[in-house]
């Protein structure tokens, strides 16, 4: 399997490193406008190949991405401290207006995995600019937010996060929605697992999830390790046809009467991309929050200067 990463910044290289050490691809092409830095990153990465299962890695131009089973987009303007993901929109739209058509000239049938922020908007932009079927354009969405949510809850409950079912849906950003009504371990709802939990404490967990990126950016400038692992999980689900349920961002198809946007819902991910969406039953409050999240994204989409 061949994959390409567009953008060799901290996120792009974290994705590359994670995929290499997990033997995800046979061939990996990396592309960046800063050729000198790109070549240095590739040199550093290939020198570790003797320690893992081999992957063919090289720096390349967009033409070298031809034949990629998946192309991962991490390129774009960097989120500044205090800047929301949505503030990034127009700067990254301008970058993608040149990038996506050029990429499609070489990879007309690829799976496109968008990681650049604001990811839901950039997934929508990539879909419209690429002309690919909706299921083949996927955003990393709230995969990372869901992981953060599960980690914090599992720490409190003293279980492995992989044994806890919990989801963050909607925008990957300030309007994201915690689906508290579906949090469970082995089918047991959270209220039965820990009935003495203070609602304020639960609210604090969600605030930690929602503000995590801002806190990390304030301290170290960017998030990288966790999203690299999350992207690897998505790529493995795609290329290994795992039919794995992940909260990726994709075009809405009438679920919950939402407007046409890209946002995250639990979706079955396999070799064809997003294969179907699992429409969970939500409480009235969760539905309202999800609609609010979708409306915020729709307003941003409507403001884009194409």
Curated annotation (Swiss-Prot):
Its main location: cytoplasm. Beta-D-fructose 1,6-bisphosphate binds at residues 150, 165. Allosterically activated by fructose 1,6-bisphosphate (FBP). Catalyzes the conversion of lactate to pyruvate. PANTHER family: L-2-HYDROXYCARBOXYLATE DEHYDROGENASE (NAD(P)(+)), L-LACTATE DEHYDROGENASE. Belongs to the LDH/MDH superfamily. LDH family. This is L-lactate dehydrogenase. It comes from Synechococcus sp. (strain JA-2-3B'a(2-13)). The gene is ldh.
């Amino acid at each position: 399997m061949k994959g390409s990463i567009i953008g060799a910044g901290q996120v792009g290289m974290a994705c590359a490193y994670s995929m290499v050490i997990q033997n995800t691809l046979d061939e990996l092409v990396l592309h960046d406008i800063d050729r000198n830095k790109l070549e240095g990153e590739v040199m550093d990465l290939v020198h570790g190949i003797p320690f893992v299962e081999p992957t063919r890695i090289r720096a390349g131009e967009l033409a070298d991405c031809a034949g990629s089973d998946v192309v991962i987009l991490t390129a774009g303007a960097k989120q500044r401290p205090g800047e929301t993901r949505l503030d990034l929109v127009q700067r990254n739209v301008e970058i993608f207006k040149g990038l996506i058509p050029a990429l499609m000239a070489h990879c007309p049938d690829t799976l496109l995995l968008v990681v650049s922020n604001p990811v839901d908007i950039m997934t929508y932009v990539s879909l419209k600019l690429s002309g690919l079927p909706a299921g083949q354009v996927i955003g990393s969405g709230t995969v990372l937010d869901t992981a953060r949510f599960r980690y914090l809850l599992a720490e409190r409950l003293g279980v492995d996060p992989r044994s806890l079912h919990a989801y963050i849906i909607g925008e990957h950003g300030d309007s994201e929605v915690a689906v508290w009504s579906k949090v469970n371990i082995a089918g047991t709802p959270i209220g039965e697992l820990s009935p003495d939990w203070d609602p304020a404490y639960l609210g604090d967990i969600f605030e930690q999830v929602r503000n995590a990126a801002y806190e990390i950016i304030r301290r170290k400038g960017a998030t990288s390790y966790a999203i690299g692992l999350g992207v690897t999980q998505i790529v493995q689900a795609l290329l290994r046809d795992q039919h794995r349920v992940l909260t990726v961002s994709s075009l809405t198809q009438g679920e919950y009467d939402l407007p046409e946007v890209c946002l995250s819902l639990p979706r079955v991910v396999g070799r064809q991309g997003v294969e179907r969406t699992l429409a969970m039953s939500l409480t009235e409050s969760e539905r309202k929050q999800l609609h609010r999240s979708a409306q915020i994204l729709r307003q941003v989409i409507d403001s884009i200067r194409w």
